Amino acid sequence: MHGRLVEMGGCGVRVRRLGKNRAGEIRIARFLHNPAVTVSEMVATAGVRTCSQAAGRHVLAIQDTTMVRSAVDGVGVALHPVIAVDAIDGTVIGLVDAGFFTRKGGQRDGRRERDFAQKQSRRWLEGAEHAAELAAAGAACVTVVEDREGDIYEDFACKPAGVEMLVRAGQDRRLEDGSRLFAKPEMLPEAGRMSVDLPAAPGRPARTAVLALRFCPVEIARPKHRKRAAAAALPKSVALTLVEAHEIDPPADGTAAHWRLLTTHSVNDVADARRIVGFYRQRWTIEQLFRTLKTKGFNVEALRQAEDGPFEKLVAASLIAATTVLQLVRERDGIGKRPLQDAFDPEDRLALEAISADLEGKTARQKNPHPRGSLAFASWVLARLGGWTGYYGKPGPIVMLQGLIRFHAIKHGWNLRNV
């Protein structure tokens, strides 16, 4: 099913397309409706494979939420995945965990009266708990990376053993000394600067930004509105480090990049602060995953499955396939020196080598520069199949997906060559 999802990715996911014929369609439908097949089992299988590749590595466990089904009668379906990324070279290691939940209009009312265990925000702590499995599997370090929606007191106070936290501050929290979080950096001298490339976003072209860095220890106070019974189990404060990165001289028609990052990592000098900002910037990886999963790739938002169970299984399978696409993108330069078997069957090697020989030109830039048997070698082949010329820019997820679609079509003919 994984291969067929990749093959159909650029056309959107449909059971009829996946099945290819009536018999195949029935098999896929039975799989999706089989109560013995669960999303948790599918995700757990992918997670075991990811854990097997984590030993000795500093892993960023990046988590975020995206809507995969728009609200109907005020109810929408959201997906919350956790992916593992190598903190040093940016290699996508794989999927750690994923879950679905419904978002209902009006739920924000009364949220302060609910226990944390009953809130949807519990998913952020659950994601960190699954990330701790990477540490148990031998990862040298695990850092959970979250955007502002993950700025939850319990996320820090109940942090699982074996992981560090890195969260972009989403609210001006009260500190134990009575001051406010956002005012802290204003009292500090600039510790140093760094330049970062900001990717394009809606209404904002890509640019290079110069960031002024400041950092200091902070002690976050327990929120006053927590229910008494639940709050009694939480510490009165949590000691963290605040790292602020504020853009200097932003474009006149743009908004300055301004990140306030809370972390459990020790930050002793400006080099440590730059490292923390670098970890946070890797969060863009999960945005690329969502882009591949949705309109620009598998188009899961257009799925016509009416029942939640089969719908979630099909989205989960698409998520696993989209993660494979992202692995190829991140290994296009061969930095991680990953083997072909990370994303391909061993028997695919001969086909990839034959296609590479056919695609290579006479100039050095038209030659596949990567060793045979490596994932980078396959990434170059798929990028060329997806329309990349080898001269301009670097191939992204959509180009790689188009290349995978073509490769699976070629592979079908390759497998029939001796029939």
List each model region and its residues:
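Single, function-defining residue in the core of a domain
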Residues: 1-62, 66, 70-78, 83-419
